[in-house]
Amino acid sequence: MLAEGRQVYLPPPPPSKLPRLSGTDPTDGVVTMAAPSPLVLGLGLGLGGSGSDSSGSDAEASAATVREARPPSALTFMQRQELEQQVLIYRYFAAGAPVPVHLVLPIWKSIAAASSFGPQSFPSLTGLGSLCFDYRSSMEPEPGRCRRTDGKKWRCSRDVVPGHKYCERHVHRGRGRSRKPMEASAAVAPTYLPVRPALHTVATLATSAPSLSHLGFSSASKVLLAHTTTGTTRAT
């Protein structure tokens, strides 16, 4: 056989196998199996003659048949995106977490655009800015799971506290806390008491009354009155 000007030798096909069953007659129970066809790669190199072309066309025909038998997708690309968004909203509902505004906003816009009353009839979300969009929450596959991680692969498996991003164990972590318990210090404000004469001063003046006549006081009561007046003046 010639292929592209060169003679290529193909080995002859193997002989047919004749398995025999045990019996008296050697011709009884002879089963003749068809010899296998020679190997055809179908690489388009000219080996195998027209067989390669026919095998290639058969493969293309079978692939076309598979494509025709496969049912077309029932959803478009936009419909699949909307379905994924609704599934994500349902996960937030199931976890008891608040749904981010940017997930609800496209639904609100589609309803407002399809309504005959116009967007003015739905003022609840009118005027929302970009601050209401939480893009990190939109990429969260498990919104009800605690977000505490070690920065690598580990992540806490507990459920979040409603209204927070972390579980009960990690919700207060990271806040500035004192290691020592705070004790209430009872600060006593300084009080100013009026100056009063001591009792021993009165007793001393009373016992020394006879010897005070040379100082110009006629009695001990006058001396006590003068001492009290002087102490009050100093206090003021």
UniProtKB/Swiss-Prot annotation:
Record domain QLQ: where: 74-109
Any GO MF annotation of the entry: ATP binding
Pfam families, alphabetically? QLQ, WRC
* Matches recorded under PROSITE patterns: QLQ, WRC
- Where does it mainly reside? nucleus
Q: Which UniProt keywords apply?
A: Activator, Nucleus, Transcription, Transcription regulation
Task: Write down the superkingdom of origin.
Answer: Eukaryota
User: Motif (Bipartite nuclear localization signal) spans which residues?
Assistant: 145-155, 173-180
Q: Where is the WRC domain?
A: 140-184
| Residue stretches in coiled coil | none
Q: Where is this region: Disordered?
A: 1-27
The cellular location(s) given in this protein's UniProt record come to: Nucleus
Q: Which GO terms describe its cellular component?
A: nucleus
GO-annotated biological processes: developmental process; DNA-templated transcription; regulation of DNA-templated transcription
Q: Does the keyword Transcription apply?
A: yes
Q: Which family does it belong to?
A: Belongs to the GRF family.
Regarding domains, what does the record say?
A: The QLQ domain and WRC domain may be involved in protein-protein interaction and DNA-binding, respectively.
Q: What the protein does?
A: Transcription activator that plays a regulatory role in gibberellin-induced stem elongation.
Recorded protein name is: Growth-regulating factor 12
